[in-house]
């Protein structure tokens, strides 16, 4: 899930400070609005990358961490009946739920990098990251639920929906191209027919002119013959 930059441009001191701030657990801060905004931006970037992944690749084949098998096994052992296609926020945020989630999350401290970082989690897995469909959760909680959604086939709804839309766009674009090609061909054929027709008319006129001239010459020849006959007599 990590992304790297291909540039070696110097990083400003301000960005270094923000990066350092984001490398610390969320509980290290109070309600600092700047830090909260930085956390929100980082969480949103993570969400965008993840949504693009499950939209472009069959989620059943995705591997989110090096320990997906362990996360999934522990998750279903501790939350066997938890519904994950549409989450109930109370199953994640209530005091009793937090008590149950805490030992599970701490088990991955040192195993999963940034295990307790704030991450955006979708409530309804068939929908995208909207304000109404998103809650904040520790990253290990995000991994546990999303790995389960991928393996159990729930996230495939997003993949199928996006692929269907792209397929429709392709069909529509193909139809437009074929229509344009047909118009061009008709225009071209019409032009050729028009040119041919014009040539035929010109040829007809030329033939008529030649015929008329031929007739006149014939009449003149007849006159000359008649004159010769009269002289001969």
UniProtKB/Swiss-Prot annotation:
InterPro entries: PBDC1-like_dom_sf (IPR023139), PBDC1_metazoa/fungi (IPR008476), Polysacc_synth_dom (IPR021148). Keywords: Phosphoprotein. Disulfide bonds: none annotated. Pfam families: PBDC1 (PF04669). Residues 167-233 are annotated as: Disordered. The modification Phosphoserine is found at residues 126, 181, 197. The keyword S-adenosyl-L-methionine does not apply. Belongs to the PBDC1 family. This is Protein PBDC1. It comes from Homo sapiens (Human). The lineage of its organism: Eukaryota, Metazoa, Chordata, Craniata, Vertebrata. The gene is PBDC1.
């Amino acid at each position: 899930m990590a992304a790297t930059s291909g540039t070696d441009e110097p990083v400003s001191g301000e960005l270094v400070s923000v990066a350092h701030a984001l490398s610390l657990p969320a509980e290290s801060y109070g309600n600092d609005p700047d830090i909260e905004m930085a956390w929100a931006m980082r969480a949103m970037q993570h969400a965008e990358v993840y949504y693009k992944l499950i939209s472009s690749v069959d989620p059943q084949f995705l591997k989110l961490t090096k320990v997906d098998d362990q996360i999934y096994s522990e998750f279903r052992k501790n939350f066997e009946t938890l519904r994950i296609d549409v989450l109930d926020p109370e199953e994640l945020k209530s005091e009793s739920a937090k008590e149950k989630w805490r030992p599970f999350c701490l088990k991955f401290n040192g195993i999963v990098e940034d295990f307790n970082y704030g991450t955006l989690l979708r409530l309804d897995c068939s929908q995208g990251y909207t304000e109404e469909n998103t809650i904040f959760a520790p990253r290990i909680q995000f991994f546990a639920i999303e790995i389960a959604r991928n393996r159990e086939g729930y996230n495939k709804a997003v993949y199928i929906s996006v692929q269907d839309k792209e397929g429709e766009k392709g069909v529509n674009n193909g139809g437009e191209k074929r229509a344009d090609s047909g118009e061009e061909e008709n225009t071209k054929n019409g032009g050729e027919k028009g040119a041919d027709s014009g040539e035929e008319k010109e040829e007809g006129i030329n033939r008529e002119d030649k015929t008329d001239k031929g007739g006149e010459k014939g009449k003149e020849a007849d006159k000359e013959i008649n004159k010769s006959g009269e002289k001969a007599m």
